[in-house]
From Swiss-Prot:
<keyword id="KW-0963">Cytoplasm</keyword>
<dbReference type="GO" id="GO:0032436">
    <property type="term" value="P:positive regulation of proteasomal ubiquitin-dependent protein catabolic process"/>
</dbReference>
<dbReference type="GO" id="GO:0005737">
    <property type="term" value="C:cytoplasm"/>
</dbReference>
<feature type="binding site">
    <location>
        <begin position="26"/>
        <end position="34"/>
    </location>
    <ligand>
        <name>ATP</name>
    </ligand>
</feature>
<protein>
    <recommendedName>
        <fullName>Casein kinase I isoform alpha</fullName>
        <ecNumber>2.7.11.1</ecNumber>
    </recommendedName>
</protein>
<keyword id="KW-0418">Kinase</keyword>
<keyword id="KW-0808">Transferase</keyword>
<comment type="function">
    <text>Casein kinases are operationally defined by their preferential utilization of acidic proteins such as caseins as substrates. Can phosphorylate a large number of proteins. Negative regulator of wg signaling. Phosphorylates arm directly or indirectly and stimulates its degradation which prevents inappropriate wg signaling. Phosphorylates smo which promotes its accumulation at the cell surface and its signaling activity in response to hh.</text>
</comment>
<keyword id="KW-0460">Magnesium</keyword>
<keyword id="KW-0067">ATP-binding</keyword>
<dbReference type="GO" id="GO:0007165">
    <property type="term" value="P:signal transduction"/>
</dbReference>
<dbReference type="GO" id="GO:0045879">
    <property type="term" value="P:negative regulation of smoothened signaling pathway"/>
</dbReference>
<dbReference type="GO" id="GO:0045880">
    <property type="term" value="P:positive regulation of smoothened signaling pathway"/>
</dbReference>
<keyword id="KW-0723">Serine/threonine-protein kinase</keyword>
<dbReference type="GO" id="GO:0035331">
    <property type="term" value="P:negative regulation of hippo signaling"/>
</dbReference>
<dbReference type="GO" id="GO:0035313">
    <property type="term" value="P:wound healing, spreading of epidermal cells"/>
</dbReference>
<dbReference type="GO" id="GO:0042593">
    <property type="term" value="P:glucose homeostasis"/>
</dbReference>
Length: 337
């Protein structure tokens, strides 16, 4: 018997909630690590998120609370269990497939307009739902949108609510107050201009971030990517300056006018104003029909897999590879470019 096998067999099993066996690490979230798990009773695969119970700023139980609030919404994973296991806070949820960042790379960093528009419709819907529940996400990026698996493989899910914040009291309907002394929360590449300026985030900022995600998929790269600087703070300032100095029409050049209309609309929203989600969805739905596309859930990666005779990508393997790639960098910062 080789040494590796002896090590594997001697390693104590981790059982979460008395029902789920931890198999292996498959990724990292904004806080903590994500593991592939399995139901001891049914053999069904699940995702298990774990963070140290001694973390300076524990987030997992807060995130579990948010998932409970969002339960029943289309495109949000179900929570199976959350609690404490020895030295860890744990959260057991539906296992999902690859992220849009994974799939963008799988498609050699090019999405057709049809794929972008099918995703846009679902992404706007996910944001509308969390806003309806009085929360803003504050970290909208391709890594936090995942496709489902099995019968949900064509459905888009929104995850990672560690940075989410309640923007309105659900009972009194009072909105949080306007402030201008906030640190940048989220990922600098997709952050709104107001977030860069230290203004308290609200619904408009999630929507603007989504606009940058759309243009990332349309262009393959955003003008403020790869900025060189001596410190992180200088880098964020350069990203902010480039973002503010790039006219929307320049950013959206080569894309249908609806994308610049979307971003101009989002940037014009007032702090407490509710976005007109239906107007925005209709903007892109009409474009979709004008281009004579069918909403058949055949994405670019669906076509690519058919051409290469591959089955559905194993979510655990894809996420594990993504995590290895990230570990090659010097750790994942909370705020990346």
């Amino acid at each position: 018997m080789d040494k590796m096998r002896i090590l594997k067999e001697s390693r104590p099993e981790i059982i979460v909630g008395g029902k789920y066996r931890v198999i292996r690490k498959i990724g990292s979230g904004s806080f903590g690590d994500i593991y592939l798990g399995m139901s001891i009773q049914s053999g069904e695969e699940v995702a298990i998120k774990m963070e140290s119970a001694h973390a300076r700023h524990p987030q997992l139980l807060y995130e579990a609370k948010l998932y409970r609030i969002l339960s029943g919404g289309v495109g949000f994973p179900r929570i199976r269990h959350h609690g404490k296991e020895k030295n860890f806070n744990t959260l057991v949820m539906d296992l999902l497939g690859p992220s849009l960042e994974d799939l963008f790379n799988f498609c050699t960093r090019h999405f057709t307009i049809k794929t972008v528009l099918m995703l846009v419709d679902q992404m706007i819907g996910r944001l509308e739902y969390i806003h309806l529940k009085c929360f803003i996400h504050r970290d909208i990026k391709p890594d936090n949108f995942l496709m489902g698996i099995g019968r949900h493989c064509n459905k888009l899910f929104l995850i990672d609510f560690g940075l989410a914040k309640k923007f309105r009291d659900p009972h009194t309907r009072h909105h949080i107050v306007y402030r201008e002394d906030k640190n940048l929360t989220g990922t600098a590449r997709y952050a709104s201009i107001n977030a860069h300026l230290g203004i308290e985030q609200s619904r408009r900022d999630d929507m603007e971030s989504l606009g940058y995600v759309m243009m990332y998929f349309n262009r393959g790269v955003l003008p403020w990517q790869g900025m060189k600087a001596n410190t992180k703070q200088q880098k964020y300032e350069k990203i902010s300056e480039k973002k503010m100095s790039t006219p929307i029409e320049v950013l959206c050049k080569g894309s249908p006018a609806e994308f610049s209309m979307y971003l101009n609309y989002c940037r014009s929203l007032r702090f407490e104003e509710q976005p007109d989600y239906m107007y925005l969805r209709q903007l892109f739905r009409i474009l979709f029909r004008t281009l004579n596309h069918q909403y058949d859930y055949i994405y670019d990666w669906t076509m690519l897999k058919q051409k290469t005779h591959q089955g559905q990508p194993n979510p655990a393997i894809l996420l594990e590879q993504l995590d290895k790639d990230k570990e090659k960098q010097n750790g994942k910062p909370l705020i990346a470019d």
